[in-house]
């Protein structure tokens, strides 16, 4: 009985983690500004701000 209870708790934890990560993926796919909730809008670059650190990143 203890094993079934433990398996149920583990399955619940895995389901909650998957639900949370899929929600984040869904929000980022449609509007990346929700990743930064304090930002009111605008473009979020996916590269570091100028000046680049040495050595320069390979693209």
Curated annotation (Swiss-Prot):
For this protein, the record's InterPro entries field holds: Histatin/statherin (IPR030773), Statherin (IPR005575)
Molecular function in Gene Ontology: hydroxyapatite binding
Q: Which GO terms describe its biological process?
A: biomineral tissue development; defense response to bacterium; regulation of bone mineralization
What is one cellular component GO term in this UniProt entry?
extracellular region
Alphabetically ordered keywords of this record: Biomineralization, Phosphoprotein, Secreted, Signal
Location comes to: Secreted
Q: Which residues carry this modification: Phosphoserine?
A: 21-22
Give the record's family classification. Answer: Belongs to the histatin/statherin family.
Q: What does this protein do?
A: Salivary protein that stabilizes saliva supersaturated with calcium salts by inhibiting the precipitation of calcium phosphate salts. It also modulates hydroxyapatite crystal formation on the tooth surface.
Q: What is the name listed in the Swiss-Prot or TrEMBL entry for this protein?
A: Statherin
The gene designation is STATH
